[in-house]
UniProtKB/Swiss-Prot annotation:
GO terms for molecular function: calcium channel activity; identical protein binding. Pfam families: Cg6151-P. Channel activity is inhibited by La(3+), which reduces Ca(2+) influx and thus inhibits it's function in promoting activity-dependent bulk endocytosis (ADBE) in response to high stimuli. The lineage of its organism: Eukaryota, Metazoa, Ecdysozoa, Arthropoda, Hexapoda. The gene is flower. This is Calcium channel flower. GO terms for cellular component: cell projection; endosome; presynaptic membrane; synaptic vesicle membrane.
Length: 198
């Protein structure tokens, strides 16, 4: 395999086929999540370096948070853009293994990587750098949930469970009858006899 074919294969990564049985995502979510992940990784590494430089103020927790944030940025960059690490052979295999896993795995991984630096050293650098990684995890979580069902499917499911309003089981004339069971109306009886009117 030539060097040009290797680069082309790595850059074609967003066009790879969706896994069988997984939810189909719109193109803007698929490419947007990758782009957000790349930008998040870059800023996480940059602001992690800023937190590491806080050793000047003798803040060990910010030093550790910066190191964790830089490692998180590196991991996100490896998984989202393995073409940035052409010199490391194992990167493409790791990215393929994670791509084969369900979307919620990647969402949970990104959210778990983003939280510790924020709690260890709360500041703009850790909040922005790790916050972008957390946002990438949130986008992957939305992609893992899949598309919303059509209106007809939701209406049919509501009628099967008896909440449809015009189903066969105990249909009433009031549309809100199935929302709250055993609800009592409010009564306005006036002031209590022992009230001090304060």
């Amino acid at each position: 395999m030539s060097f040009a074919e290797k680069i082309t294969g790595l850059l074609a990564r967003p066009n790879q086929q969706d896994p069988v049985g997984g939810p189909e995502q719109p193109w803007y979510l698929k490419y947007g999540s990758r782009l957000l992940g790349i930008v998040a990784a870059f800023f996480a590494i940059l602001f992690g370096l800023w937190n590491v430089l806080s050793i000047i103020t003798l803040s060990v927790s910010c030093l550790v948070a910066g190191i964790i944030q830089m490692i998180a940025g590196f991991i996100v960059m490896v998984l989202e853009a393995p073409c940035c690490f052409v010199c490391i052979e194992q990167v493409n295999g790791i990215a393929d293994k994670v791509d084969a896993k369900p979307m919620y795995f990647r969402a949970g991984l990104y959210c778990a990587l983003a939280v510790p630096p924020i709690f260890m050293c709360f500041g703009l650098a850790s909040l922005f750098g790790s916050g972008l990684i957390f946002a990438t995890g949130a986008v992957y979580a939305m992609m893992a949930l899949g598309k919303k069902a059509s209106a007809e499917d939701m209406r049919a499911a509501a009628q099967q469970t008896g909440y449809g309003g015009n189903g066969t089981a105990a249909s009433t004339t009031n549309d809100r009858a199935g929302i709250v069971n055993n609800a009592q109306p409010f009564s306005f009886t006036g002031a209590v006899g022992t009230d001090s009117n304060v």
